[in-house]
Amino acid sequence: KKNAMTLNLGKLVFSNNSIDLKDHRYSAKTKGVNFADLSISRFSATLDDIDYDSSSVKAHIIKLTLKEKSGLLIHNLDAHANINTQRMEFTDFALKTNRSHAGDYLLLEYNKFHDFTDFNNKVRISGDLRDAYIDSRDIEYFAPALKSVNFKTAISHAAVAGTVANFKVRN
């Protein structure tokens, strides 16, 4: 029996990096963030307490910033992250984007990473939002079909669940 690889790192610091990720099996052009063709610039972050094994990675994300070619700006992301082949969980979550900010808890569930190419229908979102402000123009980066839906809302506390195509909010 082979031993699975594990890796434990104290800290990684990224400063003003560029990353291009292209899955050549998919050539469809999409508006908004295209998870099969990402181009990220101005990527900076500190990752603390990193634990990696063959099925998951855990880390404390501190001050992650980036710009994606779609125009999406992440001004700040802080969270304790746990990512594996079927879910991404962010606790103690604080996110600031182009026009929105949100926080507390976020869970993304999927059957495989390829599901992100159909983010609106295949990635299930659940979370607990506190003291959030959401501008629909930021959601549009992930759901370009919502271009004609315009709203801005302040949320003191809400539970969210569903896919972008079928989303529910409770307070």
What is the predicted function of each stretch?
Residues 2-103, 108-125:
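Elongated, acidic membrane-bridging lipid-handling scaffolds
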Residues 30-32, 143-146:
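Extracellular loop and loop/strand-boundary signature of outer-membrane beta-barrel proteins
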Residues 71, 150-152:
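Short sequence motifs at beta-strands and strand-loop junctions characteristic
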Residues 77, 154-156:
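Hydrophobic, lipid-facing positions within transmembrane beta-strands of outer-membrane proteins
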Residues 86, 163-165:
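Outer-membrane beta-barrel channels and translocator barrels
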Residues 132-137:
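Outer-membrane beta-barrel translocator/channel fold
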Residues 158-160:
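Membrane-embedded beta-strands that build the outer-membrane beta-barrel scaffold
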